[in-house]
From Swiss-Prot:
The entry's keywords: Acyltransferase, Amino-acid biosynthesis, Cytoplasm, Transferase
Basic and acidic residues: compositionally biased ranges: 1-17
Cell location: Cytoplasm
Enzyme Commission number(s) of this protein: 2.3.1.30
Family under the similarity heading: Belongs to the transferase hexapeptide repeat family.
Taxonomic path: Eukaryota, Viridiplantae, Streptophyta, Embryophyta, Tracheophyta
Protein name: Serine acetyltransferase 5
PROSITE patterns: HEXAPEP_TRANSFERASES
Activity regulation behaviour: Feedback inhibitions by L-Ser and acetyl-CoA.
Length: 312
């Protein structure tokens, strides 16, 4: 027995230490498997993109030099998109070589950015009938390009390199007509369809597998400071010209109709339409079925035909 008042020190048992070690090893192994799978997916997609570029170069010789410089001369997706964005966003005083190094270093230092790019490419190819190939999206879809450039500006913002992040944000807005504040948080599997006129405020958050049409504003009310912009859940669909203002929550799998002005929370799998927006359906008559993901199905009008009380 230890003397009264003396604290008794107990060392962790060998069984507990062994359990912790095994748990850590299992997590490390799982992470390694996930990373290897992501690398393999990116490599497979890059092989397909290069095959598409070779096919297009043969079919249209006028594009051969362009396709070689943007895709075929590069060894990876990260290098290709860094080169392409550098040339798209450069100016007489912001050189393409500087931007290329900036983009490539950022993408190379954070594999999650590359993985998000892969998810965004697949989102455009699957959801947009006008997207004829992955290479077409990579080179020509300004919504896709704006998101990839934003991912880099956001990374710079989180590293307290705010002047550079804001300079890049300005170029993105000038070139692509897409205004996303560098502090805004955006998930993966995002489709900005047409993209012109999209505005996303500083404290906005967009989840995964979200589709947003042109002229959408995720803004503030003008009456609040701090956390003042919308939070968009996973799998949402935001129709063309919709305006969502204030620190409101659009629940996972929700839908906002085209031209709506939303000032209220929208529940998960709910639908908001009109100006000012109101909810269609409700808990007793949900407008979105459990098996549907609006951000992926891209069905903009189902709520109109299904609900006779629709008013806009």
């Amino acid at each position: 027995m230890p003397p009264a008042g003396e604290l008794r020190h107990q060392s962790p048992s060998k069984e507990k230490l062994s359990s912790v070690t095994q748990s850590d090893e299992a997590e490390a192994a799982s992470a390694a498997i996930s990373a290897a799978a992501a690398d393999a997916e990116a490599a497979g997609l890059w092989t397909q993109i290069k095959a598409e570029a070779r096919r297009d170069a043969e079919a249209e010789p006028a594009l051969a030099s362009y396709l070689y410089s943007t895709i075929l001369s590069h060894s990876s997706l990260e290098r290709s998109i860094s080169f392409h964005l550098g040339n798209k966003l450069c100016s007489s005083t912001l050189l393409s070589t500087l931007l290329y190094d900036l983009f490539l270093n950022t993408f190379s230092s954070d594999p999650s950015l590359r993985n998000a790019t892969v998810a965004d490419l697949r989102a455009a190819r699957v959801r947009d009938p006008a997207c004829i190939s992955f290479s077409h999206c990579l080179l020509n879809y300004k919504g896709f390009l704006a998101i990839q450039a934003h991912r880099v500006s956001h990374k710079l913002w989180t590293q307290s390199r705010k002047p550079l992040a804001l300079a890049l944000h300005s170029r993105i807005s000038d070139v692509f007509a897409v205004d996303i504040h560098p502090a805004a948080k955006i998930g993966k599997g995002i489709l900005l369809d047409h993209a012109t006129g999209v505005v996303v405020g500083e404290t906005a958050v967009i989840g995964n597998n979200v589709s947003i049409l042109h002229h959408v504003t995720l803004g503030g009310t003008g009456k609040a400071c701090g956390d003042r912009h919308p939070k968009i859940g996973d799998g949402c669909l935001i129709g063309a010209g919709a305006t969502i203002l204030g620190n409101v929550k659009i629940g996972a799998g929700a839908k906002v109709g085209a031209g709506s002005v939303v000032l209220i929370d929208v529940p998960c799998r709910g639908t908001a339409v009109g100006n000012p927006a109101r909810l269609v359906g409700g808990k007793e008559k949900p407008t979105i079925h459990d098996e549907e993901c609006p951000g992926e199905s891209m069905d903009h009008t189902s709520f109109i035909s299904e609900w006779s009380d629709y008013i806009i």
